[in-house]
């Protein structure tokens, strides 16, 4: 039985011996320090294999048909094929030195589209990076190499790709700004003006000599020969399960996506006149390029994935989709907009309950973000300048979107995401130190008097370039959010784009990263001072955002999301997630996706949206209800945080081993103390159960203290509020007012932070805060007050008012009926009394 294999082995040995003779042919000497080919000597050994599979050997009429033989073990993916080994036949041409000139010798011309120098290094002996190609089995296991040419290896370009008449693709408005003499910083080796990190109109003029460092790109599949280009930067995204790296050069991008939970994907972008070369056993004249669409007017895109062989494979569809991205637009804003839109669609799909697997969004979103950085790098190369606002925009979007896609699409832990990019801002350390100095020098009280757009510029830079919370920035953020809260609870705030962005950046700048509780303290400060201050202020911000997330605001915010999703269904919109940012997205309310709140949202959707939201695939009611659930579900996402803010800022909830039931609301009301609202009673804390609430949706309020793992039950007592107007002391400060419905829906949670809010609480019908005005209550609404010491009291004033409130129509009808009854009674009495007085009965008797 071993005879065929013995013959095959002898044939392989003879072939190798013949190949050794060919190596004696004079070839250019290996440059010093180049190559790692100690295996190519006269003592080459072949290990004996019991089973060897040998593929077809192609002859080459134009060159010597001698091939070098490498034998490697492999696990066959074909069913019923035994474990064995493969014989790889590498063309002799791969032994020759590269045919192209060194890339460093041809520096790019400023602003010249022909500037990119991208070369494919097809060589073994003269290749410093040969080792991965000899040791890796990825080229087999991922099936990127075809044995024969297959249909679909080179596929048609997308309809959204650029054309010869429009080579740059879609360009958004407004047009890109031009450099200004007053705000331009030149990188020409001379004295430089200090970089103003908060002035969005600052322009950086690039020194192209800084981009002459070469990048050697090596395919992670070990399926494409190394590619050399001028390096411009690197973008990294990832978490504990996924890593995404984009290597960027002049006219070049190599994107690698690898994940524990999902198949890998690689995308390579080169100039349209460059041909990358794939490793296969074809002779040089038949050597394939990697798979991808046909070349475009500027670039050529290759894509490698697990689905290259299977046209109906999910990865095949994803590969063809992302391959179109680099050629859709050179405007980085276009790609950031679509990355934001895909993120919204991902959150909506998860919230609607239609799907729990949204991993395909990972490829789409991270590819968009990578292409955005590539597009910006190319625009910088072609224009020789960069606007500071472009750098901040890219970095801010990376920090906003990456944690969401890593958590929901890649399956990573909530606090394991990371991202960085040196494409837009290669002076990150300079920017970080400058923003820290600017913030340390500001006067918070004076800063508060500035307009909101200046707050946005400052906090935006802090959010983008400070990886730790800065004391003054946290204090400023807290004061700004408090000012918004004062207006929001009175329904006097206008949630325009500036207000939404200020709120988002304030929350993000205050929170920083979740490591703030263990960061080194500021110089000269006690070890615990900064951490306790940051914790206290962030707890207060959580509470204020929760209080701003009233039922009416949640409905209006949900309606805004409905309109965005209606536009998505109707044909697509381009936007930023910050355009729909809401206090609810930074709050500790987890109940907005419940049925009651969804129905509240659906009740106010304008009729014009019903046509847009109806896709025709479902019944109208089902479709509308699904979008309502999606909108409210998105409000439940805390997109301002790249970590689990509740667990970090409310450690008392995890101080005991007892696991809490599903939480509706968390109220960090005092240091190390929080109220938690649930549907079922937890086995920890002081617990209250509300009476008169739908038994299917009960409301349970628990007061949890850090380290106290005992459980006790208490009864909510009714009471009237004492009017504290005669004293300057704030009696109810630190308390939370809750308005709820007998159906079990929580309407409002108003935090009483000062005397002004306290006086509005007892003002009755004259209150300027709608939640405190009993005239706006219906018989199905009640209110209670949660004190910071753990006492909960039912507000009798609001309950009694609602109990005796009757419609005016019923009242007037009752009065009319009463008057009519009195009139009828009067007539009867008049008749009786009149007959007796006039002796009518006597006359009647006499007559008889």
UniProtKB/Swiss-Prot annotation:
Region annotation Interaction with gL: where it falls in the sequence:
240-303
> Can you name this protein?
Envelope glycoprotein H
The cellular component terms of Gene Ontology attached to this UniProt record, alphabetical and capped at eight, are: host cell endosome membrane; host cell plasma membrane; membrane; viral envelope; virion membrane
| Location of region: Disordered | 166-191
Residues exposed to the Virion surface side: 25-808
Residue numbers on the Intravirion membrane side: 830-848
What gene does the UniProt entry assign to this protein? Answer: gH
**Its job:** The heterodimer glycoprotein H-glycoprotein L is required for the fusion of viral and plasma membranes leading to virus entry into the host cell. Following initial binding to host receptor, membrane fusion is mediated by the fusion machinery composed of gB and the heterodimer gH/gL. May also be involved in the fusion between the virion envelope and the outer nuclear membrane during virion morphogenesis.
The species this protein belongs to is: Equine herpesvirus 1 (strain Ab4p) (EHV-1)
Single GO BP term: fusion of virus membrane with host plasma membrane
Mind telling me how this protein is modified after translation? N-glycosylated, O-glycosylated, and sialylated.
Enumerate the subcellular locations listed in this protein's record, separating them with semicolons. Virion membrane; Host cell membrane; Host endosome membrane
Description of how the protein assembles with itself and partners = Interacts with glycoprotein L (gL); this interaction is necessary for the correct processing and cell surface expression of gH. The heterodimer gH/gL seems to interact with gB trimers during fusion.
């Amino acid at each position: 039985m071993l005879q065929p294999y013995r013959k095959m082995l002898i044939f392989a040995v003879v072939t190798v011996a013949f190949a050794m003779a060919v190596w004696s042919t004079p070839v250019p000497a290996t440059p010093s320090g180049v190559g790692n080919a100690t295996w190519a000597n006269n003592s080459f050994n072949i290990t004996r294999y019991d089973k060897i599979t040998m593929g077809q050997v192609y002859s080459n009429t134009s060159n010597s048909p001698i091939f070098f033989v490498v034998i490697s073990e492999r696990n066959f993916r074909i069913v019923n094929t035994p474990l064995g080994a493969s014989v790889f036949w590498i063309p002799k041409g791969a032994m020759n030195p590269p045919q192209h000139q060194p890339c460093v010798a041809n520096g790019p011309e400023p602003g010249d589209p022909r500037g990119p120098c991208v070369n494919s290094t097809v060589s073994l002996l003269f290749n410093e990076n040969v080792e991965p190609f000899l040791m890796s089995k990825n080229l087999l296991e991922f099936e990127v190499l075809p044995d024969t040419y297959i249909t679909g290896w080179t596929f048609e370009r997308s309809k959204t790709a650029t054309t010869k008449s429009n080579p740059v693709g879609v360009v958004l408005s407004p047009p890109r700004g031009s450099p200004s003499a007053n705000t331009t910083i030149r990188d020409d080796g001379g004295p430089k003006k200090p970089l103003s990190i908060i002035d969005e109109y600052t322009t950086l003029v690039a020194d192209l000599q800084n981009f002459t460092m070469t990048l050697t790109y090596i395919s992670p599949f070990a399926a494409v020969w190394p590619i050399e280009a001028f390096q411009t930067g690197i973008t990294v995204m990832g978490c504990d399960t996924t890593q995404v790296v984009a290597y960027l050069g002049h006219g070049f991008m190599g994107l690698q996506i690898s994940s524990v939970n999902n198949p890998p994907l690689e995308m390579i972008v080169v100039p349209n006149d460059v041909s990358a070369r794939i490793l296969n056993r074809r002779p040089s004249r038949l050597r394939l390029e990697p798979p991808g669409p046909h070349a475009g007017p500027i670039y050529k895109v290759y894509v490698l994935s697990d689905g290259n062989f299977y046209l109906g494979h999910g990865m095949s569809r994803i590969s063809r989709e992302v391959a179109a991205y680099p050629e859709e637009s050179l405007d980085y804003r276009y790609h950031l907009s679509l990355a934001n839109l895909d993120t919204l669609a991902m959150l909506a799909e998860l919230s609607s309950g239609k799907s729990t697997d949204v991993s395909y969004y990972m490829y789409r979103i991270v590819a968009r973000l990578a292409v955005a950085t590539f597009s910006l790098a190319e625009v910088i190369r072609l224009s020789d300048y960069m606007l500071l606002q472009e750098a901040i925009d890219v970095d801010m979007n990376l920090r906003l979107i990456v944690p969401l896609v890593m958590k929901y699409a890649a399956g990573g832990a909530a606090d394991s995401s990371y991202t960085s990019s040196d494409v837009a801002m290669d002076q990150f350390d300079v920017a970080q130190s400058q923003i820290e100095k600017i913030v340390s020098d500001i006067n918070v009280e004076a800063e508060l008097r500035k307009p909101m757009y200046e707050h946005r510029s400052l906090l935006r830079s802090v959010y983008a370039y400070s990886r730790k919370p800065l004391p003054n920035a946290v204090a400023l953020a807290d004061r700004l959010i408090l000012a918004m809260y004062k207006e929001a609870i009175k329904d006097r705030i206008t949630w325009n784009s500036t207000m939404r962005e200020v709120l988002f950046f304030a929350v993000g700048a205050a929170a920083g990263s979740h490591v703030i509780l263990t960061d080194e303290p500021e110089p000269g400060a006690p070890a615990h001072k900064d951490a306790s201050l940051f914790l206290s202020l962030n707890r207060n911000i959580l509470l204020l955002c929760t209080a701003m997330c009233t039922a009416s605001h949640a409905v209006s915010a949900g309606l805004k999301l409905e309109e965005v999703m209606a536009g998505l269904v109707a044909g697509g919109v381009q936007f930023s997630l910050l355009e729909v940012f809401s206090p609810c997205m930074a709050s500790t309310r987890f109940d907005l996706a419940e049925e009651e709140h969804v129905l509240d949202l659906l009740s106010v959707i304008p009729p014009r949206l019903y046509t847009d939201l109806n896709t025709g695939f479902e019944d109208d009611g089902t479709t509308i209800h699904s979008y309502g659930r999606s909108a409210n579900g998105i409000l439940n996402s805390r997109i301002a945080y790249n970590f689990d803010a509740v667990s970090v800022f409310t450690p008392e909830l995890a101080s005991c081993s007892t696991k809490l039931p599903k939480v509706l609301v968390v109220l960090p009301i005092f240091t190390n103390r929080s109220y938690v609202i649930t549907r079922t009673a937890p086995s920890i804390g002081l617990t209250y159960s509300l009476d008169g609430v739908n038994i299917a949706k009960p409301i349970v309020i628990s007061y949890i203290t850090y380290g106290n793992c005992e459980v006790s039950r208490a009864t909510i007592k009714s009471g009237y509020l004492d009017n504290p107007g005669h004293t300057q002391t704030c009696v109810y400060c630190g308390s939370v007012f809750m308005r709820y419905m007998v159906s079990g829906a929580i309407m409002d949670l108003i935090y009483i932070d000062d005397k002004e809010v306290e006086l509005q609480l007892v003002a009755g019908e004259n209150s300027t805060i709608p939640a405190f005005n009993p005239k706006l209550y219906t018989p199905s609404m009640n209110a209670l007050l949660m004190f910071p010491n753990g006492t909960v009291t039912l507000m009798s004033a609001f309950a009694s008012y609602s109990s005796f409130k009757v419609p005016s129509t019923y009242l007037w009808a009752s009065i009319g009926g009463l008057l009519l009854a009195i009139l009828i009674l009067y007539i009867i009495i008049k008749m009786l009394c009149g007959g007796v007085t006039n002796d009518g009965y006597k006359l009647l008797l006499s007559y008889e």
